[in-house]
């Protein structure tokens, strides 16, 4: 049985490799922004959500910069289940649910991604493994849900996105 080292940065070689690969994939523009936090899975109203946390484990907010940190600090922290990015400062995100099936991008998702008018910064597979995040250059404005039979959300501020660093190759 492996013993967890409470002050270790990584608990296994696989964890170290994932962190290194994520750092290589996440664009420098996002890594340099002090808009990072941790998140944990939590139940709310019978639904699993991703609750934002500070690197110390306190509640964080997607609208309170005092609860955000650097990419390096968020990546080093072992609090919760992963890292998240607070949208804003010209960085927005399209969140496409159920866009992947067995690792294959659905035709509707590919068509939508190819039609995105804003410059794309970074594309990744979401935490569920079935969704897609498309980080974009965007001016701040209200979020919106694009239905068209699919669940597509676009946010530019006031939200955070759980970041996996698992690059989506189109």
What residues fall within each predicted segment?
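Conserved phosphate/metal-binding and DNA-contacting active-site motifs used
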Residues: 22-170
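BZIP DNA-binding basic region
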Residues: 1-22
């Amino acid at each position: 049985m492996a013993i967890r080292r409470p002050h270790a940065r990584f608990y296994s070689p696989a964890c170290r490799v994932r962190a290194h690969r994520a750092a290589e994939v996440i664009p420098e523009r996002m890594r340099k922004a002090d808009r990072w936090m941790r998140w944990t899975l939590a139940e709310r109203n019978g639904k699993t959500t991703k609750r934002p946390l500070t690197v110390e484990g306190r509640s964080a907010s997607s609208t309170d910069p005092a609860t955000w940190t650097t990419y390096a600090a968020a990546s080093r922290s072992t609090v919760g289940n992963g890292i998240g990015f607070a949208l804003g400062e010209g960085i927005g995100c399209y969140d496409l649910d159920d866009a992947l099936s067995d690792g294959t991008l659905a035709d509707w998702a590919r068509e939508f991604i190819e039609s995105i008018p804003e410059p794309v910064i970074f594309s990744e597979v979401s935490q569920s493994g079935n969704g897609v995040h498309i980080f974009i250059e965007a001016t701040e404005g209200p979020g919106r849900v694009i239905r068209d039979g699919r669940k597509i959300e676009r946010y530019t501020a006031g939200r955070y996105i759980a970041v996996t660093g698992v690059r989506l190759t189109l």
